[in-house]
């Protein structure tokens, strides 16, 4: 819900912490 999103940091909502050294295969598969 929007209320929950507002409570969370905007950075976290806009772009979650991306560890390129530990990116899930799902993300890589989606990007391909």
From Swiss-Prot:
Keywords (A to Z) from UniProt: Glycoprotein, Protease inhibitor, Secreted, Serine protease inhibitor
Places the protein is found: Secreted
Name of the protein this chain belongs to: Variegin
Cell division recorded as keyword: no
Region (Contains the active site): 8-14
Miscellaneous notes: Variegin-derived synthetic peptides show antithrombotic effects in zebrafish larvae venous thrombosis model.
Compositionally biased tracts (Acidic residues): 22-32
GO cellular component term, pick one: extracellular region
Quaternary structure note: Interacts with human F2 (thrombin); the interaction results in thrombin inhibition.
Region described as Disordered: 1-32
Main subcellular location of this protein, as a coarse class: secreted
Glycosylation sites: 14
Coiled-coil positions: none
Domain of life, per lineage: Eukaryota
Any one GO MF annotation of this record: molecular function inhibitor activity
Function of the protein: Thrombin inhibitor. Does not inhibit other serine proteases.
């Amino acid at each position: 819900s929007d209320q929950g999103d507002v409570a969370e940091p905007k950075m976290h909502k806009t772009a979650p912490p991306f560890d390129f050294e530990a990116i899930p295969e799902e993300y890589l598969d989606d990007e391909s």
